[in-house]
């Protein structure tokens, strides 16, 4: 039986966020990677159900690989209906992109993550259950076709990633995983989604640099 549910299903929520970009080229690969529904859970032996939640933008930002982030251009698209048809998500929002609303480097990333996780949480509350695993993913990613998303047991209070892990050189070399993919139990992902509220507070206190998104905290704030 699932840890949080009484319907004898292991429930996975895949929360897509960020720009769609080359979503058409990656959709088949992504659905195969996450679709474990035809197999029982490897440890629990119960059916697996995977639901999608999508927050994305009506605009894609493009730049050449070796150019800086300040040398890019925006293109609007009308792919929302097609994305919905392919993924058949529980909830989808294609939001109007307003650059002035997100002046700093990570603003839109944290915002979109928070919105996708809020969709997931609203669905849980409405239907009185909780997902066993919640995944933060992107619409423009290609995964190794030899693998599928791992359904091993995960622990409370821990977030996992299968992508590159870097270090924060100015934060005691703590681990930092990127925005491609990470996952955790549902309450942990809700906490991570709330990073946007904290980041927004720091913005309003003029503690986040506009150009590079770095945070400048005074000693008395620790």
Over which residues does each language-model region extend?
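Short, acidic, metal-binding catalytic loop of nucleotide-sugar glycosyltransferases
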Residues: 28-49
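Catalytic core and acceptor-binding pocket of nucleotide-sugar-dependent glycosyltransferases
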Residues: 102-129, 141-146, 161-222
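Short acidic, S/G/P-rich loop/turn micro-motifs used as interaction or catalytic elements
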Residues: 19-23, 60-61, 141-144, 188
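Short aromatic/hydrophobic "clamp" motif used to bind/position activated sugar donors
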Residues: 134, 140
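Active-site-proximal specificity loops/subdomain of glycosyltransferases
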Residues: 55-127
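N-proximal low-complexity "stem/linker" segments adjacent to membrane-targeting elements
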Residues: 1-28
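Short alpha-helix within the catalytic core of nucleotide-sugar-dependent glycosyltransferases
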Residues: 27-28, 144-154
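A short beta-strand-loop structural module common to alpha/beta enzyme folds
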Residues: 44-60
């Amino acid at each position: 039986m699932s840890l949080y549910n009484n319907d004898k299903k292991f429930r996975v929520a895949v929360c897509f966020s960020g720009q769609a970009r080359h979503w058409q080229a990656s959709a088949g690969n992504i659905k195969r990677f996450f679709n474990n529904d035809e197999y029982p859970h490897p440890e629990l032996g119960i059916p697996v159900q995977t639901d999608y939640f999508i927050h994305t933008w009506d605009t894609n930002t493009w730049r050449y690989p070796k150019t800086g982030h300040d040398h890019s251009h925006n293109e609007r698209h009308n792919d929302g209906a097609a994305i919905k048809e392919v993924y058949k998500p529980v909830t989808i929002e294609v939001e109007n992109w307003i650059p002035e609303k997100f002046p700093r480097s990570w603003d839109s990333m944290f915002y979109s993550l928070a919105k996708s996780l809020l969709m997931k949480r609203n669905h849980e509350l409405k239907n009185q259950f909780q997902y066993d695993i919640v995944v933060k993913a992107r619409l423009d990613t290609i995964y190794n076709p030899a693998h599928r998303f791992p359904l091993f047991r995960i622990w409370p209070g821990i977030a996992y990633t299968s992508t590159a892990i870097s270090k924060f050189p100015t934060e005691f070399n703590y681990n930092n995983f990127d925005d491609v993919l990470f996952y955790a139990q549902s309450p942990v992902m809700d906490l991570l989604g709330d990073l946007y509220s904290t980041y927004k507070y720091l913005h309003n206190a003029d503690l986040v640099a506009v150009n590079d998104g770095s945070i400048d905290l005074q000693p008395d704030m620790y």
